[in-house]
Amino acid sequence: MPTVVVMDVSLSMTRPVSIEGSEEYQRKHLAAHGLTMLFEHMATNYKLEFTALVVFSSLWELMVPFTRDYNTLQEALSNMDDYDKTCLESALVGVCNIVQQEWGGAIPCQVVLVTDGCLGIGRGSLRHSLATQNQRSESNRFPLPFPFPSKLYIMCMANLEELQSTDSLECLERLIDLNNGEGQIFTIDGPLCLKNVQSMFGKLIDLAYTPFHAVLKCGHLTADVQVFPRPEPFVVDEEIDPIPKVINTDLEIVGFIDIADISSPPVLSRHLVLPIALNKEGDEVGTGITDDNEDENSANQIAGKIPNFCVLLHGSLKVEGMVAIVQLGPEWHGMLYSQADSKKKSNLMMSLFEPGPEPLPWLGKMAQLGPISDAKENPYGEDDNKSPFPLQPKNKRSYAQNVTVWIKPSGLQTDVQKILRNARKLPEKTQTFYKELNRLRKAALAFGFLDLLKGVADMLERECTLLPETAHPDAAFQLTHAAQQLKLASTGTSEYAAYDQNITPLHTDFSGSSTERI
């Protein structure tokens, strides 16, 4: 899950810390040292994690947007300036903004807040924010709880005694409580020094950033894998005394099933399953990450020559169009499947079902599923034209179709450019031209985007005027016809703007002689 590191750069972080036998450090130096340790760990063990860096005092600033380049994050730590008083609320508002803008409100996120425990003074201080949170309007609400699933980890550049001498610890605990109890406060054990800061950040790493390694099993075949992101414990709400369920480190495949039978089931979370490569010695299992490029290349070459069950499983599921049912724990299952990342790349994914004996009602109880060979006759029929499970409806649902997505401007621009490219290749691309044109027309009508139809019509008329003299005469006729039909649809009248109506090619005939045409 993404991580936002929030660094306090107020004046209180410049307070000196005396360390015997060495130069004088400031608290911000200790914080930067701890974050460097965290970034180095993530660069080695959490390379797929997206991390952003935010700094704050009375205002907040996004220093590094979400990235996987941990060198950039470490460079930003050394370029931070000192500012004015502390205002934690503004930092939390900034976190809300950047996470929602990048990930929306459904993706879980971890927030690491690094501060010295000073709450600020006067208006804008944490004391003032907490005292007035119940007196605010909905438009000016306190940013906690975050409007997305989250965990808030507060790293204090102070020891427990220092925080308890004021009400700082109590106010910071209120932040965790306001975030629905999701998170934890870390303090320095003993005097403020580099060693104790490393120990504190080590506890955070053990809690939140330890990679999840497991053994994938299928009969006698096994493979060491990393599951990313780390699966979170799941608490069953219906239980009288709920106990968090944690998935086993032994993931055993209990069977295989057609994709059509399992369809698109509800899941708790989705995870990448990555085979763990051998290290450069080739005799121990590691993450495959080495000190330099030459060693890394040699390690990859060694790993590429060794057969791996994870690779075999991924390829088999992709070719056969099946998914593997995997046992996660007692009465808890998931599925392994191949998911296309692009036209040429796919990943082995694992989705977790809800715990229980019957997570997918149409399959029945998982414990009662068995191989086809146990049945008296093939439940799929001799020609593979039946299914032992409730059949899916013949009409595809909207989520199963290739719908037009214009969330970003680039999506709309791509669709318009596709129409123009086909327009320049008329009449050879007549069928493709009208197919793309009707797809855009339907989407525009569905969204009420009538101005788009007029705009595309103007573009087609312009393309018609730019046709070269050598162009086929049919091209001009088709472009003019398409532009006229789009302009009629842009009026919104029911006669020309029917959603189910398609623009058909203009019937022309240039096969006869010129005298016959006259």
Curated annotation (Swiss-Prot):
Component of the Integrator complex, composed of core subunits INTS1, INTS2, INTS3, INTS4, INTS5, INTS6, INTS7, INTS8, INTS9/RC74, INTS10, INTS11/CPSF3L, INTS12, INTS13, INTS14 and INTS15. The core complex associates with protein phosphatase 2A subunits PPP2CA and PPP2R1A, to form the Integrator-PP2A (INTAC) complex. INTS14 is part of the tail subcomplex, composed of INTS10, INTS13, INTS14 and INTS15. Belongs to the Integrator subunit 14 family. The modification N6-acetyllysine is found at K418. This is Integrator complex subunit 14. Component of the integrator complex, a multiprotein complex that terminates RNA polymerase II (Pol II) transcription in the promoter-proximal region of genes. The keyword Metal-binding applies. One of its GO terms (biological process) is regulation of transcription elongation by RNA polymerase II. Mg(2+) binds at S10, S12, T86. It holds the Pfam family IntS14_b-barrel. Residues 2-204 form the VWFA domain. It is found in: Nucleus. It comes from Homo sapiens. The gene is INTS14. One of its GO terms (cellular component) is integrator complex. It comes from the Eukaryota.
